[in-house]
């Protein structure tokens, strides 16, 4: 009798004990439904995460990006940078998108981000369209990763197979944003240390710095190089002379801190390897660019020369390094949430 009573219970247990990776993507879980064989969605990101739960996700992202970048080519670099600044602070969790609230001190107000990071309205537009198509399925963290890849492609750069499945944080770290994002005047050792803390190596540092092949920087980030690089009221002697005088016309000794200069003066809206060629010619804009060549630590200088000579090599490593960066401490499984709106927690 006891056994016969137990049988229905066992049947129900078997019927409902299926792999949660095929669960419905709604209810804020954002689950995909095509987990790799032998893998687990708790610990792994994988490119097919939205194959069944939101197959049109990338198409939606690219449609918004095409319009935004056509309207303002600089936006591509802004979105690439937004992903970088997110991942270096408590992982790739979209914490950078959160606004101030009763419980959140926004990373947007940190020194490296304030009046600097941008592209939030593009992310919001992508999120709104994804919410219409696939409610509470695609995370803001994944939107940042998809937007970074799409921006690179639309600027003429490489594509890569992008692991997905990140979830969104319920917290932000203002202090982390102030201490974990490399400064534009960083030494080569500072850069290497900060990247190593995130599990990234020299190849990652140099290739990801190559993202500066697009975009601009404000005068305040490079003024020191022009007027007082070593505390002696003298310019950085590594600057090529004509480039130096051109920068002085953009960035006077006093005022003009928000004036901008392209990071790659030759092809500022095209993703190519010209950035590395310019470094060899003394035309890198930021100290953190120039020290990749002149820092005399490890093999960064050799990598600069290699990427300057071989654009394909740079593209291949950049793609690998973007995946590496995108894998920094993602929230997966039941950690975090899928935000309905990227700038507030649910």
Swiss-Prot record:
InterPro entries: Haem_peroxidase, Haem_peroxidase_sf, Peroxidase_pln, Peroxidases_AS, Peroxidases_heam-ligand_BS, Secretory_peroxidase. Residues 1-23 form the signal peptide. Keywords: Calcium, Disulfide bond, Glycoprotein, Heme, Hydrogen peroxide, Iron, Metal-binding, Oxidoreductase, Peroxidase, Secreted, Signal. GO terms for biological process: anther wall tapetum development; hydrogen peroxide catabolic process; response to oxidative stress. Pfam families: peroxidase (PF00141). Its main location: secreted. It catalyses: 2 a phenolic donor + H2O2 = 2 a phenolic radical donor + 2 H2O. Its cofactor is heme b; Ca(2+). Its EC number is 1.11.1.7. The keyword Disulfide bond applies. It is an enzyme of class 1 (oxidoreductase). Binds 1 heme b (iron(II)-protoporphyrin IX) group per subunit. Removal of H(2)O(2), oxidation of toxic reductants, biosynthesis and degradation of lignin, suberization, auxin catabolism, response to environmental stresses such as wounding, pathogen attack and oxidative stress. These functions might be dependent on each isozyme/isoform in each plant tissue. There are 73 peroxidase genes in A.thaliana. This is Peroxidase 9. It comes from Arabidopsis thaliana. The gene is PER9.
């Amino acid at each position: 009798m006891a056994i016969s009573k137990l049988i229905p219970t066992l049947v129900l247990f078997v019927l409902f004990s299926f792999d949660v990776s095929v669960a419905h993507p709604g209810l804020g879980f954002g689950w995909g439904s095509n987990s790799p064989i032998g893998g687990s969605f708790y610990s792994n990101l994988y490119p097919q995460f939205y194959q069944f739960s939101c197959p049109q996700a990338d198409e939606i992202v690219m449609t918004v990006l095409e319009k935004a970048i056509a309207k303002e080519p600089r936006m591509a670099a802004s979105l690439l940078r937004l992903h970088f600044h997110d991942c270096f602070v408590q992982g790739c969790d979209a914490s950078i998108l959160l606004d101030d609230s009763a419980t959140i001190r926004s990373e947007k107000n940190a020194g490296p981000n304030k009046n600097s990071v941008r592209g939030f309205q593009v992310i919001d537009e992508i999120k709104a369209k994804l919410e219409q198509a696939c409610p509470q399925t695609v995370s803001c963290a994944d939107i940042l990763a998809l937007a970074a890849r799409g921006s690179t492609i639309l600027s003429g750069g490489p594509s890569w197979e992008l692991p997905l499945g990140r979830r969104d944080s319920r917290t932000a770290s203002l202090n982390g944003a102030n201490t974990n994002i490399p400064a534009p005047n960083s030494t080569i050792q500072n850069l290497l240390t900060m990247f190593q803390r995130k599990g990234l190596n020299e190849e990652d540092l140099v290739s990801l710095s190559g993202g500066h092949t697009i975009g601009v920087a404000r005068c305040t980030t490079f003024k020191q190089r022009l007027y007082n690089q070593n505390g002696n009221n003298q310019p950085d002697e590594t600057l090529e002379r004509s480039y130096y005088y051109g920068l002085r016309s953009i960035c006077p000794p006093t005022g003009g801190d928000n004036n901008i200069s392209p990071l790659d003066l030759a092809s500022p809206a095209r993703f190519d390897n010209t950035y590395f060629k310019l470094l060899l010619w003394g035309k890198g804009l930021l100290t953190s660019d120039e020290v990749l060549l002149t820092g005399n630590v490890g093999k960064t200088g050799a990598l600069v020369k290699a990427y300057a000579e071989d654009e394909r090599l740079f593209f291949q490593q950049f793609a690998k390094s973007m995946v590496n960066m995108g894998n920094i401490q993602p929230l997966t499984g039941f950690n975090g949430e899928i935000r309905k709106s990227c700038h507030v927690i649910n």
